[in-house]
Regions:
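Catalytic cores of RNA-modifying enzymes
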Residues: 1-139
Length: 139
């Protein structure tokens, strides 16, 4: 993967590299060694790396082929992660409890929130989700 790969803006793709923001999101979500965490739109894995240190298991979901390849290579020796190459809207949500800490693709914010909060209320245990200002104001 080109390490200088830029986000594909028209898809709502963006990369969060701010370590303070990432650490704060993880702290706010109260992740512990018993949690399974979904990272929706895992991108280059900046957030994923930090989640792996706190959670029991991380499910990284990414739709960009180049980034999927990158994530699978980056975490090939890591036991507590599974990388799924798909659009989150087509991902089968687990039947067990999970949290979400994610820098979600902005273009599908409302769809992601609907899937998590209304279609999977029994499994979704909260977390931290980065939102673009405009969709956040609509909530």
């Amino acid at each position: 993967m080109n390490k200088n790969k830029l986000p594909v803006r028209f898809t709502g793709q963006h990369f969060t590299i701010d370590k303070v923001l990432i650490e704060d999101a993880i702290k706010q979500s109260r992740i512990n060694q018993n949690d399974t965490v979904l990272d929706i739109g895992a991108g280059k894995g900046f957030l994923t790396v930090q989640l792996l240190q706190k959670a029991k298991f991380v499910i990284a979901i990414e739709n960009d082929f180049e980034l999927i390849t990158h994530l699978k290579h980056k975490f090939k020796q890591t036991q507590n992660i599974q990388v799924f190459g798909c659009d989150f809207r087509n991902y089968k949500i687990p039947n067990f409890s999970f949290k979400v800490v994610s820098n979600i693709p902005f273009g599908i914010t409302s769809e992601i929130l609907k899937i998590l909060m209304f279609e999977n209320m029994e499994s979704f245990q909260g977390g931290s989700i980065f939102l673009q200002l405009e969709p956040a104001k609509k909530l």
